[in-house]
């Protein structure tokens, strides 16, 4: 009887394990078949997916406990899992980067077939694979950048003095690892960008002597936190380096609980959500608001609009509409990302920094630069609507997003050399004329916030949390 019960238990366990993974298969990522992706699709998909990137110091792949062993647990959560067995750099760092990017392309291109939400695809890297994952998270184009990152005891710094020497040498090359410019470029704490770098979870052990957490994982966490991005840090008392999903790790169960809770805290946008891109300067970015990813105006706009919308912040501090300004917005990664986002609605709020004398000396070009942005977003508006044809135009399906053109909010103080008179007398009239010319909706934030000097921080320029809320309310009303 006991033997029967024992055998039944084993059978049930086997059935349970099998049920978690519905399908396993391998795909080639490179023409020579040396780069491959092992795919684990869950029985009951949640729509979420994770691309796994094993460690190994860029000299080998540790793809068992830092790869395949995670599949059962992830599939049990309904998460599709894809382990990328990337090619080693051998002096060419673009090889492993390209392999992981190709894995992301395949996952997102196959999303419908594999029951995946293409906007909910994360990356999970270990050690040197953590470094590679952080490179993908900070530097790769929007189309192949993850929606969230999980970094196990990651190599972050490429400075051999504070990191894993051989990871630095193998990734940058025997000469490259001595180049201060390359070291700085690929020490990925330097590449973190507000709003553009995805939320991250960093996992390490306090006694890791191979990849010191203070000069690696914590540096990435600090950069994320300082940028106002979502980030969590889990440091366990012991475990050294390389524990991964190994059951021998003393805190294995706690790790799974922590990771599971973190994953639940990262909301996934609906596939059919209306996409709203917030383009702008530091006022959009949320300068002066701690944790601006949560409390800046785009985040508050998301809260007002609800989960039927997907609002993304593409604000960059100090940027100008003017292409000859000191920091032109259209030179930024954020601008490329905003276009790649393929928004349904675009909120443009630029012009404040253009009012500075050093920038407004090129004010005669403000109109043409604003028109350039509008036409890039809406190619169908390359030719302004002619009188008498507005009704016919309105009946046609627009070849791009709805554009909301915001005037700058009032500059209550002349901080940062910003000139409110230039804003009111020169910039706003141009915006109004362009909006009328192209049939765009204009939101006059300057007029609507003229009496809100109590809703900005001490510099008199940037809205505080209350000011961001008012902006969000005004813009939400225009969107709805």
Curated annotation (Swiss-Prot):
NCBIfam families in alphabetical order: AcxylEst_AxeA1 (NF042968)
EC number: 3.1.1.72
PANTHER family named among the record's database cross-references: AB HYDROLASE SUPERFAMILY PROTEIN C4A8.06C (PTHR48081), PEPTIDASE S9 PROLYL OLIGOPEPTIDASE CATALYTIC DOMAIN-CONTAINING PROTEIN (PTHR48081:SF6)
Temperature dependence: Optimum temperature is 30 to 35 degrees Celsius with glucose-pentaacetate as substrate. Active from 20 to 50 degrees Celsius. Still exhibits 40 to 70% of the maximum activity after 20 hours of incubation at 50 degrees Celsius.
MF-aspect GO terms: acetylxylan esterase activity
Disulfide bond entries: none
Keywords on record: Carbohydrate metabolism, Hydrolase, Polysaccharide degradation, Signal, Xylan degradation
Matching SUPFAM superfamilies: alpha/beta-Hydrolases, SGNH hydrolase
Entry keyword Hydrolase: yes
Reactions catalysed: Deacetylation of xylans and xylo-oligosaccharides
Biological process annotations from GO: xylan catabolic process
EC category name: hydrolase
Protein purpose: Involved in degradation of plant cell wall polysaccharides. Is an acetyl esterase with broad substrate specificity, releasing acetic acid from acetylated xylo-oligosaccharides and acetylated xylan as well as xylose-tetraacetate, 4-O-methylumbelliferyl acetate, glucose-pentaacetate, and cephalosporin C. Appears to have greater activity on oligosaccharides than on polymeric substrates. Is also able to release acetic acid from xylo-oligosaccharides with 4-O-methylglucuronic acid side groups proximally located to O-acetyl esters.
pH-activity profile: Optimum pH is 6.0 with glucose-pentaacetate as substrate. Active from pH 5.0 to 8.0.
Pathway(s) it belongs to: Glycan degradation; xylan degradation
Identification of the protein by name: Acetylxylan esterase
UniProt similarity note: Belongs to the AB hydrolase superfamily.
Extent of the signal sequence: 1-19
Gene designation per UniProt: axeA1
Induction: Constitutively expressed.
């Amino acid at each position: 009887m006991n033997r029967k019960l024992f055998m039944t238990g084993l059978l049930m366990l086997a059935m349970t394990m099998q049920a978690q993974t519905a399908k396993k298969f391998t795909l080639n990522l490179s023409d020579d078949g040396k780069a491959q992706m092992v795919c684990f699709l869950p029985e009951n998909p949640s729509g979420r997916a994770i691309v796994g990137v094993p460690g190994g110091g860029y000299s080998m792949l540790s793809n068992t406990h830092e790869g395949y062993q995670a599949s059962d647990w992830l599939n049990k959560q309904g998460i599709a899992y894809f382990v990328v067995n990337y090619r080693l750099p051998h002096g060419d760092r673009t090889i492993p980067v390209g392999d992981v990017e190709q894995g992301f392309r395949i996952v997102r291109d196959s999303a419908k077939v594999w029951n995946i939400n293409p906007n909910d695809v994360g990356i999970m890297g270990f050690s040197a694979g953590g470094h590679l994952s952080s490179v993908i998270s900070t530097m790769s184009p929007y189309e192949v950048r993850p929606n969230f990152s999980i970094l196990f005891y990651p190599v972050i710094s490429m400075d051999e003095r504070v990191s894993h020497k051989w990871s630095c040498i193998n990734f940058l090359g025997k000469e490259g690892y001595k180049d201060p410019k390359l070291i700085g470029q690929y020490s990925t704490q330097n590449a973190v960008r507000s709003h553009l770098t995805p939320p991250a979870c960093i996992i390490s052990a306090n006694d890791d002597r191979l990849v010191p957490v203070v000069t690696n994982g914590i540096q990435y966490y600090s950069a994320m936190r300082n940028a106002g991005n979502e980030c969590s840090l889990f440091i366990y008392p012991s475990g050294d380096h390389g524990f991964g999903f190994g059951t021998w790790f003393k805190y294995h169960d706690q790790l799974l609980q922590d990771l599971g809770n973190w994953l639940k805290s990262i909301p996934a946008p609906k596939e059919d959500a209306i996409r709203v891109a917030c383009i702008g300067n530091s006022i959009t970015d949320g300068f002066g608001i701690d944790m601006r990813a949560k409390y800046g105006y785009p985040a508050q706009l998301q809260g007002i609009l609800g989960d039927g919308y997907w609002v993304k912040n593409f604000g960059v501090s100090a940027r100008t509409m003017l292409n000859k300004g000191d920091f032109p917005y259209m030179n930024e990664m954020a601008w490329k990302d905003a276009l790649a986002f393929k928004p349904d609605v675009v909120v443009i709020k630029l012009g404040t920094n253009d009012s500075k004398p050093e920038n407004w000396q090129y004010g005669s070009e403000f109109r043409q630069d604003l028109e350039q942005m509008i036409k890039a977003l809406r190619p169908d508006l390359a030719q302004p609507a002619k009188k008498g044809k507005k009704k016919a135009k309105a009946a046609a399906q627009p070849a791009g997003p709805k554009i909301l053109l915001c005037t700058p909010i009032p500059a209550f103080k002349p901080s940062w050399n910003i000139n409110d008179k230039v804003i009111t007398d020169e910039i706003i009239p141009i915006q109004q004329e362009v909006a009328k010319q192209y049939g765009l909706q204009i939101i006059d934030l300057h007029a609507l916030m003229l009496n809100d000097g109590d809703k900005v921080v001490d510099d008199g320029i940037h809205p505080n949390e209350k000011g961001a809320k008012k902006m969000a309310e005004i813009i939400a009303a225009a969107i709805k």
